[in-house]
Amino acid sequence: MSEAQHAPEGQVIEGRYRVVSRIADGGMATVYQAVDERLGRTVAIKIMHTQLAQGPQRDQFVERFHREARSAAAIANPHIVQVYDTGEFDGLDYLVMEYVHGVNLRYEMNQQGTFSVRETLRIIGETLDGLASAHRA
């Protein structure tokens, strides 16, 4: 089954997270926008790809996935996405994260072309602040 079949729009994961739409596909997982019905907030759910979760190196990928979740959860910084929860859904590990509305930097760069010096310094400063927090965690 494809990842889209594991979390179709409208389906509720673990009786709590109602999937709204697919946001993006990554190397290890697909990310969906969802609503945490218990707390009434929008979240992002990252669900591991089926071929990794059921493949011969499953244990390694699952450990890497959980290590990523633990590492991110240890960081408290406004420039790093917060991790709220982890679990398993239809045999696939998932992690629930803060949902950040908007576009990514690559998209903005393609649209805008160049940034002012002030905007560039702001972006670099926020990025370095988040990176420093990650190194301290």
PLM region descriptions:
Residues 1-137:
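Conserved ATP-binding/catalytic core of the eukaryotic-like protein kinase fold
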